[in-house]
């Protein structure tokens, strides 16, 4: 029964993450956006450090972009369509610092998502994460850029 409740909480959180945010956030012109929700408090995760890396031809990870989530738990403007070319990317969320700032000792040092972008044509990606001190889950919302949004 406890696992069922946890599953429902996670699903509800992911719905919140995909729909929460300021008016017009769904119309974002950003080709890569990050949304983070605190599952413990049921609110956006504010000031989460985000680092994005791009995999180089030699297999190393090169820094690509960085920032922190806003009061809405979102990070826009990480890159442009011109710079966000086909490739393998890694998004790393500094979950340890987030939980430590709240006085909680977390299990994970960070949460990461590794994905291939734009291999099927130009797309916009929203990486959504649901955080708790001992677990995290992620999902991606992938869409075609809207006409006139480029």
Curated annotation (Swiss-Prot):
It comes from the Eukaryota. Glycans are attached at residue 118. GO terms for biological process: purine nucleobase metabolic process. Keywords: Gamma-carboxyglutamic acid, Glycoprotein, Hormone, Secreted, Signal, Sulfation, Thyroid hormone, Transport. The modification 4-carboxyglutamate is found at residue 62. SMART domains: TR_THY. It is found in: Secreted. GO terms for cellular component: extracellular space. SUPFAM superfamilies: Transthyretin (synonym: prealbumin) (SSF49472). Gene3D superfamilies: Transthyretin/hydroxyisourate hydrolase domain. L-thyroxine binds at residues 35, 74, 137. Detected in plasma and cerebrospinal fluid (at protein level). Highly expressed in the choroid plexus. Detected in liver. The keyword Disulfide bond does not apply. GO terms for molecular function: hormone activity; small molecule binding; thyroid hormone binding. The modification Sulfocysteine is found at residue 30. It holds the Pfam family Transthyretin. Sulfonation of the reactive cysteine Cys-30 enhances the stability of the native conformation of TTR, avoiding misassembly of the protein leading to amyloid formation. CDD domains: TLP_Transthyretin (cd05821). Residues 1-20 form the signal peptide. Thyroid hormone-binding protein. Probably transports thyroxine from the bloodstream to the brain. Belongs to the transthyretin family. Homotetramer. Dimer of dimers. In the homotetramer, subunits assemble around a central channel that can accommodate two ligand molecules. Interacts with RBP4. This is Transthyretin. It comes from Sus scrofa (Pig). The gene is TTR.
């Amino acid at each position: 029964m406890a696992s069922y409740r946890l599953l429902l909480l996670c699903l509800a959180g992911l719905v919140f993450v995909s729909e929460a945010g300021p008016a017009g956030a769904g119309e974002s012109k950003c080709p890569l956006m990050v949304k983070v929700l605190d599952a413990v408090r049921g609110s956006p995760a504010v000031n989460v450090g985000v680092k994005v890396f791009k995999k180089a031809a030699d297999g190393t990870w090169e820094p690509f972009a960085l920032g922190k989530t806003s009061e809405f738990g979102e990070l826009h403007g990480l890159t442009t369509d011109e710079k966000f070319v086909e490739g393998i990317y890694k998004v790393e969320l500094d979950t340890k610092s987030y939980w430590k700032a709240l006085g909680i000792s977390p299990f994970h040092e960070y949460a990461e998502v590794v994905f291939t972008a734009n291999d099927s044509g130009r797309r916009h990606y929203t990486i959504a994460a649901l955080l708790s001190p001992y677990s995290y889950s992620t999902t991606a919302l992938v869409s075609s850029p809207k006409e006139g949004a480029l």
